[in-house]
Amino acid sequence: MSTNSFHDYVDLKSRTNTRQFSDDEEFTTPPKLSNFGSALLSHTEKTSASEILSSHNNDKIANRLEEMDRSSSRSHPPPSMGNLTSGHTSTSSHSTLFGRYLRNNHQTSMTTMNTSDIEINVGNSLDKSFERIRNLRQNMKEDITAKYAERRSKRFLISNRTTKLGPAKRAMTLTNIFDEDVPNSPNQPINARETVELPLEDSHQTNFKETKRNTDYDSIDFGDLNPIQYIKKHNLPTSDLPLISQIYFDKQREENRQAALRKHSSRELLYKSRSSSSSLSSNNLLANKDNSITSNNGSQPRRKVSTGSSSSKSSIEIRRALKENIDTSNNSNFNSPIHKIYKGISRNKDSDSEKREVLRNISINANHADNLLQQENKRLKRSLDDAITNENINSKNLEVFYHRPAPKPPVTKKVEIVEPAKSASLSNNRNIITVNDSQYEKIELLGRGGSSRVYKVKGSGNRVYALKRVSFDAFDDSSIDGFKGEIELLEKLKDQKRVIQLLDYEMGDGLLYLIMECGDHDLSQILNQRSGMPLDFNFVRFYTKEMLLCIKVVHDAGIVHSDLKPANFVLVKGILKIIDFGIANAVPEHTVNIYRETQIGTPNYMAPEALVAMNYTQNSENQHEGNKWKVGRPSDMWSCGCIIYQMIYGKPPYGSFQGQNRLLAIMNPDVKIPFPEHTSNNEKIPKSAIELMKACLYRNPDKRWTVDKVLSSTFLQPFMISGSIMEDLIRNAVRYGSEKPHISQDDLNDVVDTVLRKFADYKI
């Protein structure tokens, strides 16, 4: 065999093997299920055949080259060329380069010629010619070996991918299963696909085939084992793995096929049952459909005997039973054939559903098939119910096909309780509150207390307001009077800038809505934010003055607030305003105090006189007055002094007491309020500030300062005197004393008053 013919043969063989292992072949028939075992066995046998063929071809090439070498040596017998090819002819073909490569599935190192015995004569031209021939032959061998190794590696990669992954699986329809037989069934010979006739047979290949023939694995029961686990369990040789794998996958394929047949049979049964039950209206139509069913049964594809084989029989039985049921009208409703057959179908459907549950993981379209099956079950039940209804009607009168209309339901009288419409009510949206036909949208909850809540709302034009919602007992006259009094006071102080403005209000059954200005922050929030910060008397002086201005407006209007606390002073656009006149009341013109029958105010800021009962008179008619509480303008000044005390010391005067002890401490005159000169952070407190707090916190209401006097105190109106003025004052005082060593008390008082009048010009 020449070199060109050898190359052509190797190329042809490579293309043949490549086509065998390729996945891109053209399918003329519907795609089949993959057979991993068949592919593995075919690859093993083809590999062994190709190895033998390659070894024989390589032996022929080696012998051919050896004969050429001998002929050349006979024609030119140089004495030094006797052992030229001894390295290749002394061993068998299996020890050559090709034999080593084929037996080991990887490329070995290139062999070199044994030229230890060759004697080279450099001066002889004939030796040079033979040397070139020998080099040419060696290059040719290396070229052939390299090409063969490259093709061999390509075939190995293709075959390895095919045997591991197998050809691509393709979904099969039920029609393909019934119209054509499944290839590679267990009865088919294993070597049916081997069509290549090998010219040479090796003993290794013959023994391999005989081993496959002699071993009988038809009765294998794998159970839950795979082929590899089965071989390990029974200590079988690994050479039998392809055959066992093929048997394993053949059995799996047969089980899938049987499962598909059973599923198809159950669908066919349901479909035919539905079509039969829907044809109960006409006897002629039933006869025609019997003929069509008979013709359809004759044209059905050949399949194995399974549950589907009884589907056509069951459908014919259903039709015959339905005919008999229509012809015989004396049968009872519940013992009629249609009920019996329906029960039989239900039992078959239950058994089929159990089988489908087992095969759910095998079918590739299980979910879709189950949905279709459920729809068919529903349609079948509806059709059977219609058939039973029609059968009952036909048993009575075959000419009547309509139902008697149902009787009208008895007329019942309904009693509706209509609630009175509220002028201010919640709309369908819980965030919308309507007050006097104006809608307000709730934004957030600002605060709550008792039975009232204050919301931040948004009205027309995106303006922000404060909405106070108060719920009360509609039959409590005192509550209603209190709310009316608050509204009257706000109406009275409507034009005052230091009082929160009442914009709108509405009182319904048990609900009161007040629309007022919305503040940015209250004084309690400001004090909490400044807790822990260094004491700033300018801050204390500013907010004390703002607070007193609000109280002055209320007192000038003859009103006692009675519940002054930091939370009732709100900043509205930078101006501090007073709010919450819920328990305030006007002071009669003939007195400075008012009396209440209930305790009012916040305990931390309540005056002692608001807690101590008055000494009632001896008059029996006025004994009930001993339970009343005395409140007046001085009570508001006590509350104001408590707020100033909290701004300086960080807590109210009686803040160290808890619960009931706090009330007892306020009423007990022996419990003195401390006024330290330094704070807890060792910050010095001016004497003017201590003097102001003491003036507001006298236990005797008559000794407390009024609002006007507190506003004119030295703490709020300090002197701003420079150093030069103080120097001039000292010089003048010394000069005046030296000139008049003896001065009377009256003259001294006149001098002091004059100096103070001049200092008044330097007040802030």
UniProtKB/Swiss-Prot annotation:
Where the record annotates domain Protein kinase, the positions are 440-720
Query: What name is this protein filed under?
Result: Serine/threonine-protein kinase MPS1
GO molecular-function terms, A-Z: ATP binding; kinetochore binding; MAP kinase kinase activity; protein kinase activity; protein serine kinase activity; protein serine/threonine kinase activity; protein serine/threonine/tyrosine kinase activity; protein tyrosine kinase activity
Q: Basic and acidic residues bias: where?
A: 201-216
Q: Which GO terms describe its biological process?
A: chromosome segregation; meiotic spindle assembly checkpoint signaling; meiotic spindle checkpoint signaling; mitotic spindle assembly checkpoint signaling; protein localization to kinetochore; regulation of attachment of spindle microtubules to kinetochore; sister chromatid biorientation; spindle assembly
What single Pfam family name could you report for this chain, choosing any that match? Pkinase
Q: Where is the composition biased (Low complexity)?
A: 85-95, 272-292, 306-315
Renumbered residue ranges of the record's region Disordered: 66-95, 197-216, 258-316
Q: Name one GO cellular component term.
A: spindle pole body
Instruction: Establish whether keyword Repeat is in the entry.
Output: no
Signal peptide location in the record? none
The alphabetical list of record keywords is: ATP-binding, Kinase, Nucleotide-binding, Phosphoprotein, Serine/threonine-protein kinase, Transferase
Q: Where does ATP bind?
A: L446, G447, R448, G449, G450, S451, S452, R453, V454, K468
Q: Which species does this protein come from?
A: Saccharomyces cerevisiae (strain ATCC 204508 / S288c)
Q: Does the keyword Kinase apply?
A: yes
Modifications made to the protein after synthesis: Autophosphorylated.
This chain's function reads:
Involved in mitotic spindle assembly checkpoint signaling, a process that delays anaphase until chromosomes are bioriented on the spindle, and in the repair of incorrect mitotic kinetochore-spindle microtubule attachments. Phosphorylates SPC105 on MELT motifs; phosphorylation is required for recruitment of the BUB1-BUB3 complex to kinetochores. Phosphorylates CNN1, which contributes to the enrichment of CNN1 on anaphase kinetochores. Implicated in spindle pole body (SPD) duplication. Phosphorylates the SPC29 and SPC110 spindle pole body components.
What is the top-level taxon of the source organism? Answer: Eukaryota
EC number per UniProt: 2.7.12.2
| UniProt similarity note | Belongs to the protein kinase superfamily. Ser/Thr protein kinase family.
Q: Where is the active site?
A: D563 (proton acceptor)
Query: What is the reaction catalyzed?
Result: L-seryl-[protein] + ATP = O-phospho-L-seryl-[protein] + ADP + H(+); L-threonyl-[protein] + ATP = O-phospho-L-threonyl-[protein] + ADP + H(+); L-tyrosyl-[protein] + ATP = O-phospho-L-tyrosyl-[protein] + ADP + H(+)
